[in-house]
């Protein structure tokens, strides 16, 4: 069963439109949502979660219509958005005490397990954490109510290479049980080269391609030149696609 199915999702703003976005996330897989800044990645995630109200389309989670069963679905997902500072002067323990009230399946033992795993001190204030530790804390909250689907917006943005490497390793461990899945947006394509199973590429509010990573890479073979001795990387695909789009628009 698909954990997430997004069907023809659209949202229009002055000067920008998310148009007929469709893709699916399956159990035990990591889906990377790529695109340059302003392509529509965050709007897609916010529309999926009903943080902004889509103009049309539907979202199914765990076989249920998300917009009709939003409360029930949100019990089974974890959401991490970059740049969220919660209450910077509050201790982690205080933030957790409030957060746990929202989840019927909150598991304190599991929470303490992740605190130890991520080397987090819940007597620290949120503002005292590095960017990497903030993401780990938010992941701890997301995982402590047995979330089946994690939705992450630019989770590795602004992290140093060591912290990014550690988080990508954590993502792989999370999905190793083949029951949980991750959907995360990023413009750092090297992260997806290392951990993604599937790729959805958004350009100017449209899904250019959504497929498993190997099929995705093969579908852009037409961008290769006689000088390319190896298959194109995600970064090369994105650069050549965006450059082509810019050249056509400029001309």
Predicted segments, located by residue:
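Conserved ABC transporter NBD signature motif
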Residues: 57-68, 72-73
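Catalytic Walker B motif of ABC-type/P-loop ATPase nucleotide-binding domains
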Residues: 150-154
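ABC-family P-loop ATPase nucleotide-binding domains
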Residues: 81-137
């Amino acid at each position: 069963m698909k954990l997430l199915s997004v069907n023809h999702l659209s949202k229009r703003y002055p000067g920008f439109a998310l148009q007929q976005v469709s893709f699916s996330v399956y159990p035990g897989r990591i889906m990377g949502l790529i695109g340059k800044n302003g392509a529509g990645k965050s709007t897609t995630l916010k529309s999926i979660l009903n943080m902004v109200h889509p103009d049309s389309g539907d979202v199914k989670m765990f076989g249920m219509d998300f917009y009709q069963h939003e409360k029930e679905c949100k019990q089974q997902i974890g959401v991490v958005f970059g740049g969220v500072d919660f209450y910077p002067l509050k201790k982690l323990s205080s933030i957790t005490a409030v957060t746990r009230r929202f989840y019927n399946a909150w598991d304190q033992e599991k929470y303490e397990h992740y605190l130890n795993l991520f080397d987090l001190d819940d007597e620290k204030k949120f503002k005292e954490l590095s960017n990497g530790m903030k993401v780990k804390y938010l992941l701890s909250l997301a995982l402590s109510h047995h979330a089946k689907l994690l939705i992450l917006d630019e989770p590795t943005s602004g992290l140093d290479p060591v912290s990014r490497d550690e988080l990508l390793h954590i993502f792989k461990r999370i999905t190793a049980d083949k029951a949980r899945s991750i959907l995360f947006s990023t413009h750092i394509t090297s992260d997806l080269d290392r951990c993604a199973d599937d790729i959805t590429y958004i350009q100017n509010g449209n899904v250019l391609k959504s497929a498993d990573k190997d099929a995705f890479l093969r579908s852009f073979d037409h961008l290769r030149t006689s000088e390319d001795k190896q298959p194109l990387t995600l970064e090369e695909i994105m650069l050549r696609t965006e450059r082509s789009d810019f050249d056509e628009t400029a001309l």
